[in-house]
Amino acid sequence: LVFLALFIVAFTIRFPFFFRDYIDKDESTFILMGQAWADGYLPYLTLWDLKPPLTFGYFGLMITVFGKSLWWIRMGGVFIVSATSFMVYAFLRNNNNSEKKAFILALLSLYFSSLFGSVQGVMSEHISMFFYMGGLVVWGYAYKELTHKKWVLWGLGGFFFGLSAMSKLNLAYPILLCAAYISLKFLLAKGIKNTLILSFSSGLGVLIGIGVTAVPYLRENAFQEWWKAVFLAPRAYAVFHWNTAFLLLPIVGVLTFLLVKSLQKPQNKKSDKTNYPLVLLSTIGMLGSFIMAGKVNGHYLLQCYPLIFILCAWLGFERYLSSKKAIGLFVIFCVLLPFESYKEYGAIYKNKQVHGTYYNGEGIEIPAYLKKKQRPLDNILFLEYHIGYWILDKRPPTMAVTHPSNLFRNHLFPYYNKRKTAQEELSYILDSLKPAVIVIDHKNSIFKGRGVLETQFTKKMSQRYTKDTLIGKAQLYQILPFSK
């Protein structure tokens, strides 16, 4: 019943966003990568993006099972968010928290994982935390017993953790911290032999979780491509910035202080703080990974919300749970909070009245226009609204523009691209491939403020292309006849 309640709430909040062309560029990219996998082409071999393969595997699975449907892809997101929130509930119940408290915190985790910014789609953070919370719940249960005899559980938890890292690689940091802590705890309490059994079973689980994603590449004799994309390219992408460090280090310091305090207090099976160190270490590892990456995007925080609301259980607000006034205010808060969803319900209703369909956005309208006008569909460059490729059953012209922003990431080119610079890539696309149609944002072109690249793009467009039409924020350009 708890899962069903969470599922209904998640569905209600997220449903109006099922019909948007794209919610975040990353999700559109994942759909393209997943479609290629569903068509029989492994990630990184025909299209490329900087994420581990399991993220694309989700989209490929949904497309394979349900066909090309934004509805089903995002319905799967409802299940993932609901299940992750339910695992927050299960973790808290396993640590002797009341049903009411556990449900409230799970509900808040669900809300924050579905609202505020471009998180109503299915992000890699959603997928990774689904597996990570699975591992944390299993390890948390086994840790309460503090015995190596539950080696199957240690291995299963490790397997979930391995899968989580293959959805979002930064989770390797919290996994390593938790594993090191548990091993040290076992070493001090149970001796070397039992610690080795624990470490072997949990470590083997993690390695199996990682290794299963390499199997398809070994079969295709493409292990090197997997290795470069999963492990080498992310190292090149991460750039340490002091601004990010100064922002997050104070929070890490507070969490470390709480961790030290928690370790000073003896725990038992009936305590609600038995797994407190695991959650704190997970949060510290998560924030540490952001510091190492040098940036914090809004959707990165999706990985923190389940952990933060678990930590909130130890704030001690039990007395408010018996107050009808407090519960009433909380209900009102929950009703008012999803204002983005209410706004989107209005938008899809209006779109239905005007266009006869709930599906909306430039990524839907541009393909419809191109088909209606019988424009060439085999050679299109979407520099915005690139979900349009998927709607048209096409693929991006080169691997570097699978995600349009990857065009500017020269430091990643050595891991997948024959061309070494963005200028070379742009010249290849415009001079050799000569897209028949190019789509950009008419006000905020991705080349804006890019110096040499902006000049190069603007010059080529003025020489070879003419404006076709404006659809929403999308400006379509058509190649001039003499330029073909």
Regions found by a protein language model. Name each.
Residues 180, 356-410, 416, 427-449, ...:
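Short periplasmic/luminal acceptor-recognition loop of GT-C membrane glycosyltransferases, typified by
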